Amino acid sequence: GFNPWDDDIDVFMPRDDYERLFELWPKYADTERYSCLKTTKDKFIGNIFTTIVDNNTTCIKPPQKDLDIPQGIAIDVFPLDGCPIGIKRKMQKLNALIYSLYIAQEIPKNHGPLVTAVGALMLGIIPMRSWRVAVGKAAEKRMSRYKIEDCDFITELCAGPHYMQNEYPKRCFDGVVRKNFEGYEMPLPAGYDEYLHIAFGDYM
């Protein structure tokens, strides 16, 4: 069931499907009931991932309390990306950090004084919100250029600095198993246990 300290459901999608979700949403979804939100040049939502919100509910998160966006019970959707090796991996993580900073547009906290100072400096260099989004989107293109089928590992680049370090064997996502969740049968990655141990350690 739900963890008592969490307030939403997290869903993974391969990068190509993740991008198609946002593009196809206006055509196929019940847009009166549900909103699909992602920061663009025209809309700032304060997240570095996509959020699907139930418009018939209210759930306001403190960092977003002043934003003019639908704020309700949400599903957070994260892309899965191919994970290269060597210098390409280092550059991928650098671009993921740039993406995260300029899309969230918030000084990093809880990562040490150096990261906080560098984040504040980088945001100060580009003060306009639209310019920050443009820089973030350019970094997103660079970090997501590696296809899953061309790599031996998978990573998650839109879940924050800690998780972008993780490298998951592709076998974790090679198939699907179904498990009961709150009375519903839900699909999970076949290697969910290995994934959870890499992401959270002794998660039980």
Please annotate each region the language model reported.
Residues 1-9, 13-20, 171, 198-199:
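Active-site nucleotide-donor binding segment shared across nucleotidyl transfer reactions
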Residues 23-24, 89:
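Short, conserved acidic/polar surface loops in the N-terminal third of protein domains
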Residues 25-85, 105-199, 204:
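Conserved catalytic core of two-metal-ion nucleotidyltransferases
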Residues 86-92:
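A short secondary-structure junction signal
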Residues 95:
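A contiguous, mid-domain pocket- or channel-lining segment that forms the substrate-recognition surface
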